[in-house]
């Protein structure tokens, strides 16, 4: 609003200028920051240092390989069946039917004391198509505690880390290495004989569930028991702690098709054991008993542990009550029991490797006589007592060691039989080959028998067999060869020498599958008669016999007059020859009695009926034998030289074999 005219307006306000002085701020010195990359490198170095302190021993060797484990076959019923159990330990990771043959992986592993796995892939290659074969599903399960038997079912398998593979599918199962780590910063011990718990490692079990059916047959439901899958494992192992033990490379993995059943029974202390007379199974499981000497084991459990896996178990599982699950699982551990009966082999049964190491047996009464039917049995050797035996490493197939006789073998009447050895055989390259024909002149019997003459009223004596007939006899001479009888090979094989004593022959007749040329006394068409006054029973079930003649007698006999009937009594373990003497007794021999066998009632075979053999001429060995040793070494390794001096060719051969084995062992260690 403006002021009126003639009046002064309000006084204007005076403006003040405020001057502010700027203060100079001095920035604080800050510590220079390190680049982020430098800090990261420092952290990485710290992490690397910590890893080096905690990861365990340094890796000395890495080995990658492919192992063909075996095959899975069809299932005969609707049960859950364990087909294979494969230990991840590199000494045991081999073909399940390789025997004692070493593998590239086992040779490498035997040179170190620690192992672990960097990669493990399981390949299922189908061998049957889903269009033709149906009904079965296959499982693979990882078992962290592989040395312990457990009750198994489809549900327990699916609760573990597992794979489920239908028929006809090609499948790769990749097992994470973190699930295979060992107790020592991820490492496992190599030698399972030192500490089974920390060395055996995990295992992979392969199963089939439900009956396998051949779909091509529409009219009937036909089981298919052929191959379903081929199992291969591609793996990478890490090794540490160089500690060569060559014998660990040849631990046994073998599949045996038994021909004799396995029996479950109890020892006198009540412990559960299995017994068998099967030739191949006994030869394998008893191979640690060795030759009998003053320091040989004669009683108690054997040193070797064996894992046994079989398919045929369900039928007898109920016979051992609460322990039936052990049989149903199809896997257990056994140890040979020494000091048991000689006619059978006896093995203690354990539920785990740890129990076997402590000899903690199962005490459960067996109801009645229970047998596991003959079939396929997988046997895995878990321990090797002698780990450094010179020259024992096998690079190829080696025949099984013949079973050694139990007990003393001198004097010969004390020799005990070995179950399963044939009553008539030839022996070559460690193998017993049983006779397969029933012809004559196959064996000679000699000895100093206990003898007596008995007589009575006329009664029928002899056997009706082939063209042989019985006759009325009033007098019989008896020759008991049980104590002193010796059996020699006869005819064309006579150079084979002595093959049995009377005692070992009786064991062979009881346990062997092939009994030629011995005849069963109760066979169809064989009718025996024995006078009541003889004092011996009429030959029957469990007894065997041969017609024998004096070594100078080449005539054909169709009646019991003039021949010997040699009877092996199974119940009384006696070997007795009976001679019919209706007119006069034989005079006491003026030389050692020798008899040869004749096919009952038929003409003697005189070809080869001799009692000497041609002398073999020995020739000098190859002069270039030493070069066989030098060829094992590389040409540039001039420091490796051997100079073998021998006084004779025979000594050279023995020394040659020794140095060959030593050279092989050294080359393996060097590689």
Swiss-Prot record:
Low complexity composition-biased segments: 1-11
Signal peptide feature range: none
Post-translational modification (record): Specific enzymatic cleavages by the host yield mature proteins.
UniProt-annotated stretches for the region Disordered: 1-39
Coiled coil region boundaries: none
Example of a GO cellular component annotation carried by this entry: T=1 icosahedral viral capsid
Location in or out of the cell: Virion
InterPro entries hit by this protein: Astro_capsid_N, SP2_M, Viral_coat
Biological process according to GO: symbiont-mediated suppression of host complement activation
Biased composition (Basic residues): 25-39
Start and end residues of each stretch annotated as P2 globular domains: 407-609
Start and end residues of each stretch annotated as Acidic: 610-671
Keywords, in A-Z order: Capsid protein, Host-virus interaction, Inhibition of host complement factors by virus, T=1 icosahedral capsid protein, Viral immunoevasion, Virion
Membership in a protein family: Belongs to the astroviridae capsid polyprotein family.
Entry function: Self-assembles to form an icosahedral T=3 immature capsid.
The name this protein goes by in its record: Capsid polyprotein VP90
Organism: Turkey astrovirus 1
């Amino acid at each position: 609003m403006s002021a009126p005219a003639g009046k002064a307006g309000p006084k204007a306000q005076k403006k003040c200028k405020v001057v502010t002085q700027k203060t100079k701020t001095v920035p604080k010195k800050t510590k220079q920051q390190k680049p982020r990359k430098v800090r990261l490198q420092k952290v990485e170095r710290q992490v690397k240092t910590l890893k080096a302190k905690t990861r365990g021993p340094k890796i000395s060797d890495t080995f990658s390989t492919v192992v063909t484990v075996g095959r899975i076959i069809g299932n005969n019923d609707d049960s859950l069946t364990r087909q294979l159990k494969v230990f991840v330990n590199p000494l045991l990771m081999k073909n399940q039917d390789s025997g004692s043959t070493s593998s590239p992986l086992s040779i490498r592993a035997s040179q170190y004391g620690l192992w672990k796995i960097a990669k493990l892939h399981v390949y299922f290659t189908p061998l049957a198509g889903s269009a033709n074969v149906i009904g079965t599903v296959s499982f693979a399960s990882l078992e962290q505690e592989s040395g312990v038997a457990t009750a198994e079912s489809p549900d327990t398998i699916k609760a573990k880390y597992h794979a489920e593979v239908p028929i006809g599918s090609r499948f790769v199962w990749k097992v994470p290495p973190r699930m295979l780590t060992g107790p020592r910063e991820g490492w496992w011990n190599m030698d399972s004989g030192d500490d089974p718990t920390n060395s055996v490692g995990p295992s992979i079990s392969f199963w089939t569930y439900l009956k396998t059916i051949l779909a091509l047959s529409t009219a009937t439901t036909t089981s298919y028991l052929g191959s379903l899958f081929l199992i291969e494992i591609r793996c990478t192992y890490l090794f540490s702690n160089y500690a060569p033990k060559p014998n660990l490379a040849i631990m046994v993995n073998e599949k045996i098709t038994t021909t004799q059943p396995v029996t479950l029974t109890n020892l006198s202390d009540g412990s559960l054991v299995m017994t068998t007379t099967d030739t191949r199974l006994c030869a394998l499981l008893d191979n640690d008993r060795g030759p009998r000497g003053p320091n040989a084991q004669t009683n108690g459990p054997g040193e070797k542990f064996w894992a046994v896996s079989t398919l045929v178990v369900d039928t007898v599982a109920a016979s051992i009550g609460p322990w039936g699950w052990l049989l149903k699982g199809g896997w257990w551990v056994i140890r040979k029991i020494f000091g048991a009966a000689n006619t059978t082999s006896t093995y203690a049964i354990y539920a785990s490797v740890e129990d076997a190491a402590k000899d903690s047996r199962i005490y459960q009464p067996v109801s009645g006589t229970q047998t596991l039917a003959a079939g396929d049995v997988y046997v895995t050797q878990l321990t090797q007592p002698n780990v450094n035996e010179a020259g024992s490493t096998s690079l190829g197939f080696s025949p099984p060691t013949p079973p050694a006789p139990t007990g003393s073998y001198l004097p010969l009447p004390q020799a005990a039989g070995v179950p399963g050895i044939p009553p008539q055989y030839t022996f070559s390259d460690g193998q017993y080959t049983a006779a397969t024909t029933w012809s004559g002149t196959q064996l000679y019997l000699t000895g100093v028998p206990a003898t007596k003459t008995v007589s009575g009223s006329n009664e029928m004596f002899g056997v009706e067999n082939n063209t042989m007939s019985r006759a009325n006899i009033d007098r019989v001479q008896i020759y008991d060869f049980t104590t002193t009888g010796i059996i020699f090979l006869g005819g064309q094989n006579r150079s084979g020498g002595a093959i049995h004593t009377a005692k070992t022959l009786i064991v062979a007749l009881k346990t062997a599958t092939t009994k030629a040329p011995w005849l069963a006394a109760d066979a169809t068409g064989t009718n025996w008669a024995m006078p009541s006054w003889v004092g011996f029973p009429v030959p029957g079930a469990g007894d065997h016999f041969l017609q024998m003649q004096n070594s100078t007698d080449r005539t054909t006999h169709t009646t019991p007059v003039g021949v010997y009937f040699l009877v092996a009594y199974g119940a009384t373990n006696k070997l007795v020859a009976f001679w019919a003497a209706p007119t006069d007794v034989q005079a006491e021999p003026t030389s050692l009695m020798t008899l040869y066998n004749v096919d009952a009632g038929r003409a003697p075979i005189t070809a080869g009926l001799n009692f000497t053999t041609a002398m073999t001429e020995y020739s000098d060995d190859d002069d270039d034998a030493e070069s066989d040793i030098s060829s094992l070494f590389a040409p540039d390794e001039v420091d490796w030289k051997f100079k073998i001096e021998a006084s004779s060719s025979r000594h050279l051969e023995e020394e040659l074999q020794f140095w060959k084995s030593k050279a092989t062992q050294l080359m393996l260690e060097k590689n």
